[in-house]
UniProtKB/Swiss-Prot annotation:
Annotated localization: Cytoplasm
Domain of life: Bacteria
Pfam annotation, one family: DHHA1
Family according to the record: Belongs to the class-II aminoacyl-tRNA synthetase family.
A GO biological-process term: alanyl-tRNA aminoacylation
Record-linked SUPFAM superfamilies: Class II aaRS and biotin synthetases, Putative anticodon-binding domain of alanyl-tRNA synthetase (AlaRS), ThrRS/AlaRS common domain, Translation proteins
Cofactor note: Binds 1 zinc ion per subunit.
Entry keyword annotation includes Calcium: no
Name of the protein in its database record: Alanine--tRNA ligase
Keyword entries, A-Z: Aminoacyl-tRNA synthetase, ATP-binding, Cytoplasm, Ligase, Metal-binding, Nucleotide-binding, Protein biosynthesis, RNA-binding, tRNA-binding, Zinc
Source organism of the structure: Streptococcus pyogenes serotype M5 (strain Manfredo)
Gene for this chain: alaS
Entry keyword Protease: no
PANTHER family: ALANINE--TRNA LIGASE, CYTOPLASMIC, ALANYL-TRNA SYNTHETASE
Amino acid sequence: MKELSSAQIRQMWLDFWKSKGHCVEPSANLVPVNDPTLLWINSGVATLKKYFDGSVITENPRITNAQKSIRTNDIENVGKTARHHTMFEMLGNFSIGDYFRDEAIEWGFELLTSPEWFDFPKDKLYMTYYPDDKDSYNRWIACGVEPSHLVPIEDNFWEIGAGPSGPDTEIFFDRGEDFDPENIGLRLLAEDIENDRYIEIWNIVLSQFNADPAVPRSEYKELPNKNIDTGAGLERLAAVMQGAKTNFETDLFMPIIREVEKLSGKTYDPDGDNMSFKVIADHIRALSFAIGDGALPGNEGRGYVLRRLLRRAVMHGRRLGINETFLYKLVLTVGQIMESYYPEVLEKRDFIEKIVKREEETFARTIDAGSGHLDSLLAQLKAEGKDTLEGKDIFKLYDTYGFPVELTEELAEDAGYKIDHEGFKSAMKEQQDRARAAVVKGGSMGMQNETLAGIVEESRFEYDTYSLESSLSVIIADNERTEAVSEGQALLVFAQTPFYAEMGGQVADTGRIKNDKGDTVAEVVDVQKAPNGQPLHTVNVLASLSVGTNYTLEINKERRLAVEKNHTATHLLHAALHNVIGEHATQAGSLNEEEFLRFDFTHFEAVSNEELRHIEQEVNEQIWNALTITTTETDVETAKEMGAMALFGEKYGKVVRVVQIGNYSVELCGGTHLNNSSEIGLFKIVKEEGIGSGTRRIIAVTGRQAFEAYRNQEDALKEIAATVKAPQLKDAAAKVQALSDSLRDFQKENAELKEKAAAAAAGDVFKDVQEAKGVRIIASQVDVADAGALRTFADNWKQKDYSDVLVLVAAIGEKVNVLVASKTKDVHAGNMIKELAPIVAGRGGGKPDMAMAGGSDASKIAELLAAVAETV
């Protein structure tokens, strides 16, 4: 077996499959594009679903890739096991209706065992297969595999809901008896026992059925086109080929671990407690790649995952004695390890380091707050005479403050307290159940549509015309091809068309189809790409249509021009964002409609009003500069040399279209555009908002809509000016400010009067002191306007030694407000109010010295006051 670096393994994999006629699919962005079922790209096949379900027909049905992936369903196992990772690389080879079982197995065996390639010893390889899949068993035998090395497994059948499914065959490497101390042998495989002896290195999925949950597996229908989907973990291959005990001792992780050794002054011990080293090395890889791909730490979705990973890594750094920010210093090492195939980490290093460091600094402040929270919890336990920290409190520390359970346990035990592990597990399960319920159900490849996939007739979109005559090539009605149609809705394909099919954020054209008499025979309501790329017109049929007949196709010209204004303005906006807030502000989605444009982009904070003003000004400057817009067709490399921005998630063919707006903007784009930027007329941003962690959205209007937006603002300003009696519009702001200042003065004066009134009333309230259990208590109903007045009473009470405990109740509107304040350690205000609040049908809580509650039953106020003495 050859000893290869991870880069050599990856390259040899791709080279082998290229030699078998496969095209190399570049690794896609970790953030899925147009797939709401996935939080992250989590496998090599995840980006190829459109090929497998037939919605897009690939030029080459044989594909290979090395795909960066993230899975976060078992973060807690990372660092504990030899092979769990959050980010990993999946090597794959795929066949879309081309070769099948025989070639997949034969070529796979050749790659693994041939001296020209990986040169694995044959006697170290074991294969599992689905018991009913005798074809795979026989093919392995034909390759020279001993029957004793073939293990039937009932679970070797791949399916996720409806869609492509089939048996799979897995390949394992036997690391020998040293990794099997109990000498269990092949039972480890047959009974699926977790072990370190037989390492799964490759899985070959043989997709030959369309799974249907409504019928038994034996009744699944055969796919029109059978597919091959395989996955081999690079980290596992590297561990085997480099003789490493775990994945972490390979060249993918050890350089990071060495840097952590330098930062911590500790030494990594392969056989000792090395979990913190592993966690840090794994998590910084995921953070570096995910942030480089546009995901940013936040409080939900992908952002929450990244924040959790970063905080977990930071806490493990502290366990190694690293108390300052340090993770950002590891980004360079990650980039250097992966540079040969993933140069983007080094290219975006400054931005990634900035985000990681800023998040570390924020978390440092959070840790201080969390430590304070833990100290408060432990002090409360001491005051209450309890010896166990509750699971819900441990979970809050873990979930809100990012404290690993081990750290909480360590600190609590140092202080002499036990840990409620079961309560923590229960709280964790509740959160996981909520998360699962919120996930969009999906994952299936979807059923293949043979009718659409079977359209092979050529069709060409004509950019520079609004009307043309063309022959009708295909009619599909009720999901079947037909020669004619006279009513209902149908899908049409023409030899050529002026109708733009929805793509790249630009909506489809609408319009009409006319016969040779000039009569409208169909209304075009939508246009989408067919699997083989033809524009597929969805039409409402008004009169007879037949294949082979020529028709006149006319788009709605006014609508197209309005869409083009917004699309061209989107390109200007993208460039302006780069100039004003930074090149990290890359497109994360767009929509160019007739009435408005919507642009989503990566950014870690809200765009300030000043920045929005600069962006809007810059876009309008380019409009007024009347920049010529040109389009060029060329290859991708030439386009990039021209400075064209290629968007993540977009797949480009051999020939691409470059849209250039003067010297200001150059982008790869297949959409339609104006001839000159001046045709946009005017650009106005109407909204900027966050739509998820690390993603912002700008909604803007152009032309007539922009003018109307400005006019609406002017009308509103005129109305304000009239209300405040400003002689001119320019005086309105000063008038409003003067009114605001006057209002603030009145509010201040009113507050002072309230305080004086409260102080006067307090004198009467504080006279009535009772005693219970050696504690002096004041308990009274007061007449106040709001809950703030209760706090004012409490502030006055604190100034003098009126009593040890104060309980105030007020009926304000339909609600009852309760306040408890305590000056003595013997009475916990928060606990006391939890007992009192239910009496008035309320609830609340607070700190040991101050707590408040709200209720709804004012008839029970007297009962509450009577119960005060008993609750002390």
